[in-house]
Amino acid sequence: MVTQATSVRWQLWIVAFGFFMQTLDTTIVNTALPSIAASLGENPLRMQSVIVSYVLTVAVMLPASGWLADRIGVKWVFFSAIILFTFGSLMCAQSATLNELILSRVLQGVGDAMMVPVGRLTVMKIVPREQYMAAMAFVTLPGQIGPLVGPALGGFLVEFASWHWIFLINLPVGVIGALATLLLMPNHKMSTRRFDISGFIMLAIGMATLTLALDGHTGLGLSPLAIAGLILCGVIALGSYWWHALGNRFALFSLHLFKNKIYTLGLVGSMSARIGSGMLPFMTPIFLQIGLGFSPFHAGLMMIPMIIGSMGMKRIIVQVVNRFGYRRVLVNATLLLAVVSLSLPLVAIMGWTLLMPVVLFFQGMLNALRFSTMNTLTLKTLPDRLASSGNSLLSMAMQLSMSIGVSTAGILLGTFAHHQVATNTPATHSAFLYSYLCMAIIIALPALIFNRVPPDTGANRHLAR
């Protein structure tokens, strides 16, 4: 007979597999983009839509995931998430055109948007509150392994098999996870308040149209008139949501959140900072392969120091913030990240290849320091009644800003390279240098926002990871 403790451990393993699938897929695709472009007959400098479609879908669908889990039950929502993600992976591998791949990535994104938040919710429901921290540490460990092996595994599969396998490897894991969910996962439900479907649709339209407008000319080849129409539609949709949410206690996100100055400052700073940081995972593998002529596997291996730096920094973030305070940490980490990011193409083009892993290591450290500090600053002063809404809005804003960052990186590369691809040439080096210079400026600008954070010397025992 299976004991309750054993059953809970198996359930935690199911959630952990979901975390692993999500983080692996997030990092494995970037390294493969040039090879996917070659296979589909596309320009590798115009492949940002493959990333944007996925991240934007996650941003749009996140607000609905928690409500669905409470209404339908965590078991069936988590099962559906794994099925959608796995089927989306199969469709990605079967894609013969860029548009087919983009649509398949949207399907993956829907599954991802439900998988991780519902996984966290599942842990909250199946373990006692005093064991929650230990349980989350257990289920997120595979999620930390995913980014570590993702870039190198993606490069290896592309180089020694084909790009299709970066999606096909999700199939056996997905099938096992889905069966285990059916057999072992309890179906916890909770009473729910009315879901703000009108607000959800307005926000979804606003985010989607504005992001598509940003990527419209470079990635989608839209006309100026179509782009203007998308911008107008997005502005109207977001303005309509603001009007809809005024005095509406059932609004998807309460406007009372913005009466909290620290939350508003943290949210704006977090969004602007993640636009710059979102450019890095997209830009770096393309620079290594197109700019320097690295093989996909070599480019994937070069990304590992960045992940190690990020994981290492997470162990000392609390001490750093307690010592220097939020404002000094955020301002200095932001400016240092801009300098370190710009130094990568300079070091590489000058032939100092041995320094590149060091640069990427510090890039990962500074990124992790900013992310965790921003998350905690944004949420730390919210009252309990607004904590859930504020956290959901922050999660959505994080994904949205990352999609904007990838779109911006694609625009910069397309502009400076004039959409012409020639591997490891002076013209290509110049295009990447100009792109990195603009990216460094974008990364540095949020320091102006973070400089407005009030001086803070309070202890922070639990920083958001």
UniProtKB/Swiss-Prot annotation:
<feature type="transmembrane region" description="Helical">
    <location>
        <begin position="219"/>
        <end position="239"/>
    </location>
</feature>
<dbReference type="InterPro" id="IPR020846">
    <property type="entry name" value="MFS_dom"/>
</dbReference>
<keyword id="KW-0813">Transport</keyword>
<keyword id="KW-1003">Cell membrane</keyword>
<keyword id="KW-0812">Transmembrane</keyword>
<feature type="transmembrane region" description="Helical">
    <location>
        <begin position="138"/>
        <end position="158"/>
    </location>
</feature>
<keyword id="KW-0997">Cell inner membrane</keyword>
<feature type="transmembrane region" description="Helical">
    <location>
        <begin position="290"/>
        <end position="310"/>
    </location>
</feature>
<dbReference type="GO" id="GO:0022857">
    <property type="term" value="F:transmembrane transporter activity"/>
</dbReference>
<feature type="transmembrane region" description="Helical">
    <location>
        <begin position="430"/>
        <end position="450"/>
    </location>
</feature>
<keyword id="KW-1133">Transmembrane helix</keyword>
<feature type="transmembrane region" description="Helical">
    <location>
        <begin position="12"/>
        <end position="32"/>
    </location>
</feature>
<feature type="transmembrane region" description="Helical">
    <location>
        <begin position="329"/>
        <end position="351"/>
    </location>
</feature>
<dbReference type="InterPro" id="IPR036259">
    <property type="entry name" value="MFS_trans_sf"/>
</dbReference>
<feature type="transmembrane region" description="Helical">
    <location>
        <begin position="72"/>
        <end position="92"/>
    </location>
</feature>
<protein>
    <recommendedName>
        <fullName>Putative multidrug resistance protein MdtD</fullName>
    </recommendedName>
</protein>
<feature type="transmembrane region" description="Helical">
    <location>
        <begin position="393"/>
        <end position="413"/>
    </location>
</feature>
<feature type="transmembrane region" description="Helical">
    <location>
        <begin position="267"/>
        <end position="287"/>
    </location>
</feature>
<dbReference type="InterPro" id="IPR011701">
    <property type="entry name" value="MFS"/>
</dbReference>
<keyword id="KW-0472">Membrane</keyword>
<dbReference type="GO" id="GO:0005886">
    <property type="term" value="C:plasma membrane"/>
</dbReference>
<dbReference type="Pfam" id="PF07690">
    <property type="entry name" value="MFS_1"/>
</dbReference>
<comment type="similarity">
    <text>Belongs to the major facilitator superfamily. TCR/Tet family.</text>
</comment>
<dbReference type="InterPro" id="IPR023721">
    <property type="entry name" value="Multi-R_MdtD"/>
</dbReference>
<feature type="transmembrane region" description="Helical">
    <location>
        <begin position="49"/>
        <end position="69"/>
    </location>
</feature>
<feature type="transmembrane region" description="Helical">
    <location>
        <begin position="165"/>
        <end position="185"/>
    </location>
</feature>
<feature type="transmembrane region" description="Helical">
    <location>
        <begin position="195"/>
        <end position="215"/>
    </location>
</feature>
